[in-house]
């Protein structure tokens, strides 16, 4: 599993790609100050879902890292209008998949990390 510091870095890089240009610099600085929230969910399945997940998720999400048959790390949009970046890690074994998501949130929690997991599970049909 990736560490929170790496998740924070990946979130900030994704936010910068989603909001390019000099005019967005104040927004990027403010985003960097937000807290990272984490959510995790383990789901039982029959057989290793890696290939199905890779095919279904990489059409819509950005692959940041992968290890065949066991690990995917994706960048996705979550929250209202998919405007808040989330980083989701999927770890596969013979009979389950564990999804761990990180997202930044302000004073009012929007449960963006949980929403990212829910979206991934829907794409996987779980």
Where are these regions (language model features)?
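Ser/Thr-rich, low-complexity intrinsically disordered terminal regions
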Residues: 1-126
């Amino acid at each position: 599993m990736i560490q929170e510091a790496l998740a924070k870095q990946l979130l900030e890089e994704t936010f910068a790609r989603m909001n390019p240009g000099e005019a967005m610099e104040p927004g990027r600085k403010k985003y960097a100050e937000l807290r990272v929230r984490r959510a995790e969910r383990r789901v039982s399945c029959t057989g290793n879902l890696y290939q199905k997940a890779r095919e279904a998720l990489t059409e819509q999400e950005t692959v940041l890292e992968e290890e065949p048959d066991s690990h995917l790390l994706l960048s996705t949009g979550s929250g209202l209008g998919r405007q808040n970046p989330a980083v989701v890690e999927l770890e596969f074994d013979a009979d389950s998949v564990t999804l761990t998501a990180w997202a930044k949130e302000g004073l009012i929690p929007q449960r963006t990390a949980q929403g990212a997991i829910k979206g991934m599970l829907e794409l996987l049909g779980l």
